[in-house]
């Protein structure tokens, strides 16, 4: 059973490769995203399926550390990351599409889903009644993530 599904998107005045570099620089997420207070890379090598890291953030009412893992990666167009939080699985898909007359910009779309199939019937009922309170807050966090990704991609574009 899916809980919330949140779609957010923006257009960034930087090419997909630069935006991809920001999204996949998970070791520095705490320096880029205001919703992340700490990030620690747990695997070695380049960003790809299996890359794992731990970060501290607030999402869907959960405050604290969570371990994330890349489950899909199609550089520089699409990636999906997943985290288990309690009995839930939170999955975020990033889709990067070239935009603008010369494809110098990027349309970045994020879809975040919380999968609650492992919750008890009572827990799912409680979510149905009270889960909406976290929806608006989480949507705002994701919109801030988009703003922060845009700011960092633009900053990197102007840094020699």
Where are these regions (language model features)?
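Beta-strand elements of well-folded, non-transmembrane domains
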Residues: 12-14, 61, 114-118
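Short beta-strand segments that buttress and anchor functional surface loops
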Residues: 51-58, 79-85
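Beta-strand/loop substructures that line and gate deep hydrophobic ligand-binding cavities in soluble
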Residues: 84-144, 149-151, 160
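Hydrophobic ligand-binding cavity/cleft-lining segments
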Residues: 1-44, 48
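A short, structured loop/turn motif at beta-sheet edges
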Residues: 16-17, 44-47, 71-76, 95-107, ...
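Hydrophobic pocket/interface hotspot
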Residues: 19-23, 29, 53, 70, ...
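Generic C-terminal helix-cap and adjacent flexible tail
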Residues: 2, 16-17, 151-160
